[in-house]
Amino acid sequence: MKFTLVATVLLTFSLSAFAVEYPVLTTASPDQVGFDSQKLHRLDGWIQNQIDAGYPSINLLVIKDNHIVLQKAWGYAKKYDGSTLLAHPIRATTNTMYDLASNTKMYATNFALQKLVYEGKIDVNDLVSKYIPGVKDMPGDKIKGKDKLRIIDILHHVAGFPADPQYPNKNVAGKLFSQSKSTTLEMIKKTPLEYQPGSKHIYSDVDYMILGFIIESITAMPLDRYVETTIYKPLGLKHTVFNPLMKGFTPPQIAATELHGNTRDGVIHFPNIRTNTLWGQVHDEKAWYSMGGVSGHAGLFSDTHDMAVLMQVMLNGGGYGNVKLFDDKTVAQFTRRSPEDATFGLGWRVNGNASMTPTFGVLASPQTYGHTGWTGTLTSIDPVNHMAIVILGNRPHSPVANPKVNPNVFVSGLLPAATYGWIVDQIYGSLK
């Protein structure tokens, strides 16, 4: 008995001695980690000029060498109620939560997949039909290939699916119309391929809707519950959730988006469309109407500090503090350039050529990766410079520039702030 007890103690001590302790974020002055503070401070005036010109708000956080060196908010979380400018707009703070839009794909869906791959619960070369049996070729399909679709094809956006079938808009979706999650899965199975899988690259929301369903199939949990309980909670994240208004948050904590629901200032109509200013609900139509606010492609809300922790997990090679989600091999696997398109890894956008300059600027290393979100969000992770940048914004919280010409271009989208690369370059240009 004594021998067993001693052996157990020694084994416990041995395991604890080899336990991985990952770096955690601390605060440092820019000068301490190689920035010229005076140059970096110039960014303050440039961003404020964009706010004065009409950009709703920008929240910015910069990480360098495991330190937060800049965290600041500019502008307004809510300045409009419909078309009316508020007499007392709500200022954005560094705690303001934002609709991440397509950054959901990385910090919910990809994080979940990276964890499941590391745990051996899924292989990216598995067939999609292993987890969603109904994804298969049908006799009347003009383009076939669903039978052989692999998860890696979905992640590389070469699976053949259209970019945006607009399931909740019956006028566009036709027979694929859906405004319920269970029906949406069936409509995805029926969605025709637009091209032969592997023959070209089309960035598709459908791909990540499918990945969300696959995660739910493997974990037997809703996507939001899985990521919130197994990823965000262990990391100590307090403001990273789907459907925040259902989880204890209030509108004043969140940045508002489109002024007139999803109508693009009154030119788009479909059953159940929202018409009031969106405030605390996901903007994305498929995520809200077709998926109940929780989807693999959109729906996540967060603030800059929580996003900084998630980016630091990637810089650390898969963990934070005493929490390990995956390993450095998994990070390398998911951020490796796709053979079909050098600007994509497994889901991650990669700084693979000059086409990514509007996103990552001209000064970030070629190994930089991250993602953007339609609402005005950017994450940029540079493992060479051990640096990361998160920009959160609410770009659609402004009038549509010309609804009849292009309902998807907002006044704020015409400003330089809508192109993240110039902000990224100002930050890199401040390095000594």
UniProtKB/Swiss-Prot annotation:
Instruction: Spell out the coiled coil positions from the record.
Output: none
Q: Which residues form the signal peptide?
A: none
MF GO annotations? serine-type D-Ala-D-Ala carboxypeptidase activity
Q: Which GO terms describe its biological process?
A: proteolysis
Q: Where are the transmembrane segments?
A: 7-25
Enzyme Commission number(s) from the entry: 3.4.16.4
Cellular component terms per the entry's GO annotation: plasma membrane
| Pfam families attached to this UniProt entry | Beta-lactamase
Q: How would you describe this protein's topology in the membrane? A: Single-pass membrane protein
Q: Which UniProt keywords apply?
A: Carboxypeptidase, Cell inner membrane, Cell membrane, Hydrolase, Membrane, Protease, Transmembrane, Transmembrane helix
Question: What does it catalyze?
Answer: Preferential cleavage: (Ac)2-L-Lys-D-Ala-|-D-Ala. Also transpeptidation of peptidyl-alanyl moieties that are N-acyl substituents of D-alanine
Highest taxon of the lineage: Bacteria
User: Where's it found, cell-wise?
Assistant: Cell inner membrane
InterPro entries (alphabetical): Beta-lactam-related, Beta-lactam/transpept-like, Diverse_Enzym_Activities, Pept_S12_YfeW/YbbE-like
Which PANTHER family does the UniProt entry name for this protein?
Answer: BETA-LACTAMASE-RELATED, BETA-LACTAMASE-RELATED DOMAIN-CONTAINING PROTEIN
Q: Which family does it belong to?
A: Belongs to the peptidase S12 family. YfeW subfamily.
The name of this protein is Putative D-alanyl-D-alanine carboxypeptidase
